[in-house]
Amino acid sequence: MNTHPSPHASAAPRPTAGSRAARHLHGFPYATVQLDRNGAPVDPAELRQAMSELSTLDPSDVLVLVHGWNATRASAEARYGRYLGHARTLIDGRLAQDLRGRRFAVIGLVWPSIPESLQSPTDASADDVRAAAQEAFPHDAELLRAVRAGQVPDREHVERLIDHVTESEIFTQEPDLPGREPGRASLRGEALDLGTLWRDIVVWASYYEMRERAGRIGESGGRGLVRDIQKAAPSARVHLLGHSFGARLVASVARGPNGDPPLTLASLHLLQGAFSHFGFGAATGPAPEGYFRPVLTNRVVTGPILVTHTGNDLALSILYTLASTFAGHTRSVRGVNPFGAIGVTGALNAGAQRFVLDAAAPLTFGNGQIYNLQSDAVIPNHGDVEQLDVVRAVLRGISVT
């Protein structure tokens, strides 16, 4: 049993005469709640105000939006505004009948998704590199000895690490990655000096660091936030939507730590999720069940669980595979890449129903079911998920709850 007090306890006061009116985005009552790396509110007054506004509003539905990797508060709120712009268009038009009578409120959760040690990767100090290497490669004793001594690992060792991942079929192509991540030629050291090559590997290491942080925040502060919402608006349906590592965060909210009292959620929406495609999977032969399997078996989500996935997501295809391979995470099932991300192939071994998501898809969902939405036609890459038809799928999922 988890006996640690929530940092969110008693954070949902009843409204007072001095409470200010809620902020609106595209006509939706909206508030941002920012959490720190341990899941505690950065500004407890911000959380209290958001819950006070919910109590006043008495919404029928509360939608919690969660951003992914490498986002600031400003960029997260801009993304949330794009989601809600599409939602307003749909609720006022194509989906007006489906959502008639619903009173929405929206919480935008912001979490520290940029590693402190790598906020400026080109200026990372030796201490930063050591911390990131320890986080990403905990079982590589030879590598850790080098970085603890303040050295760049020798070229032979770096090449062995690279050989381990570039033999994967993922590297039969040479796609361009967003930002400054190198392609296969750069990984081989053909165009980069060894120090730059090592720094790029440390950038990948930060991917693993954020994976762990998202799960930790979801199981602590994110889960506490949902409980606060349910206290402030007890009749409201609560819907969670997460992108990238935000999908891992909201899945962790739904699962919770072992022994924690269960939550009930109305729907769960995972957009290009950065966790294993076996995360919801049943045990198969020697492979154990996925970490998030209890979300299904315990019927935490009364409505639909929607999972977008696409082969267009080269960032997940490559970065997730690299990080998982380096960290030694695997759940082998014969004939399937053990390191695949749910945002590339969907939820596997989970009894998911499959839809092709495009402008013409009718999108008829049922309660208590997980759906893989093949999104090649509407999601062009890892980051561009705030598309009209993605939001339409989310709202159609909400409409059946």
Where are these regions (language model features)?
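Lipolytic serine-hydrolase domain surface
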Residues: N2-A40, P115, A124-D127, Q151-E156, ...
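Short, surface-exposed "cap/lid" segments of acyl-processing enzymes
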Residues: S55-D123, L144-A191, R223
